[in-house]
């Protein structure tokens, strides 16, 4: 089975999520699958750039490359999990915390953006739509 592991990439930053994705790909390959990481660069500031990156992620079609189907996509990080694939499931490592727990605690940088509340609502709506559309 050809599997794409979806995550965002912040250039020059590497941490636990990146190691998790690499280890997941390695394990899938060890079990006989053909797996690879599919990364999308992500910048979340200022707010209009965040909205652009959400749209850009949604516009990606990951169902095939070079005419060869990708059988499954595993979404790990926002907004990469918004990319289109008909057989997508989610192993959520990173939601956009500024729209969730950091917002609730008052620590979200998004709160200081003039469009912060609208962006938070957009993120919630995009996540709900993506998760609802998943066949899993």
Which residues does each predicted region cover?
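Active-site donor-binding segments of glycosyltransferases and PAPS-dependent sulfotransferases
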Residues: 31-80
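Short catalytic/ligand-binding loop motif for oxyanion handling, primarily in non-cytosolic enzymes
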Residues: 13-14, 44-47, 80-84, 97-100
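Short, contiguous strand/loop micro-motifs
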Residues: 10-12, 49, 114
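Membrane-proximal helix-turn-helix segments that form the acceptor-binding/catalytic region
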Residues: 109, 113-136
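Active-site proximal beta-strand in glycosyltransferases
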Residues: 74, 83-118
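Structured loop/turn residues at beta-strand edges in well-structured enzyme cores
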Residues: 68, 83, 132-133
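N-terminal subdomain of nucleotide-sugar transferases
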Residues: 1-40
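Conserved acidic residues
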Residues: 71, 86, 135-136
